[in-house]
Amino acid sequence: MKRVAILTTDLYQPHCDVNDHFNLAFLYALAQQEKLQLGGIMLDEDKPDPEITPEICGDPSVESIAQLNYITAIPVPCAIGSRIPLRCEEDIQVVISSGKKIPSISLLLGILESTNLPVDIHMCGGTRDVLLASRIRPDLFTKDRVRVFVNAGTWKIQTPLEYNVRLEPYTFSQLFQLPCQVLWAPCFDEAVWPFHVTEFANYFMMEIGPLFERISDSMKNYFLYMFDRVVNTGWFTYLRGSVNQESLSKWSQQKRCMWSMPGFLMTADCYVDTDGNVTDNPENSVFDYVPVKVSCSPDGLVNWKLCAESEETNIKIFHVRNTEKYEEAMCTAAYETISCLGK
């Protein structure tokens, strides 16, 4: 049975982190291949904290979603989330009791109410909107039909806190109390550069050049619109224009950090073997998720331990089964998956 994917993302134009635009393209590619149904995009409202991320970012990037909607002919809805900080339980109750409608939460709850398909929520940005939705309608977050993929945190050394956890430690901590299945993918072993592939983190580094060699002109323009931090409103004209070869050459030399894509593949019931092939066979997969017991303090510090399959838990942690092959395999899978767009 095909699953519905919902993405929460801190996607901006001009961008904050280019990875968010790659995540978006990867999900659309899986939807175009009919491996999942892309139900909606929940956009973070708040700008990044300048003390954490000094880059100047724009508004939530509805342009990027519109570009991919056009390229794929898949009309995916999007909505913008809450801007009210949630630092404690009292803050959550104040927002809920106000009765004010929050667009992204309305989108999420509407999908959960209307579909008979299982739903996967991929959290690749802020944590507040999904948590608020789960408090408003906990009956919709049942273990048998909803999985929440939490792409945040570190699994080994937790100081300093990873970016998304540091933004709102309390809401992050509450995600582990959700009644549905929770699949936690830490970003790193510790949030200190340089980053490395490690056993329980989904980070990998990807060269941009090999992707640009494979993709259509419209997808090149999708990425260049983001990389060049274009601020004019002509996103559609830009998408259909000629490719700026100088810019393409410049960005082809880059390497960029990637996360989250393994979880998207799980929604598609797919895995990646050691040669980078996307397959439905988990036998030779470079990653999986394994059951854990988790507790998390209100300040975002996680204590976890592996547990046996027979032990009762609704939480799993991301696991790299082959640390030597993982990065290369994930890069190959990303290149081949995204290359289908616009062709």
Language-model-derived ranges and their functions:
Residues 1-5, 23-38, 166, 185-343:
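Conformational coupling and interaction surfaces
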Residues 2-60, 90-198:
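Active-site histidine-anchored catalytic micro-motif
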Residues 79, 149, 265:
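Residues in well-ordered beta-strands of folded domains
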Residues 31, 69-73, 112, 179, ...:
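Structural signal for hydrophobic packing residues in well-ordered secondary-structure cores
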Residues 83-84, 126-127, 270:
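Short glycine-rich anion-binding loops that position phosphate/pyrophosphate groups of nucleotides
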Residues 80, 124, 262:
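Short glycine-rich loop/turn motifs that provide flexible caps or phosphate-binding loops at active sites
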Residues 31, 67-73, 174, 208, ...:
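Short, conserved catalytic or adaptor-binding loops enriched in Gly and charged residues
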Residues 2, 52-116, 323-325, 329-343:
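Metal-dependent C-N hydrolase catalytic cores
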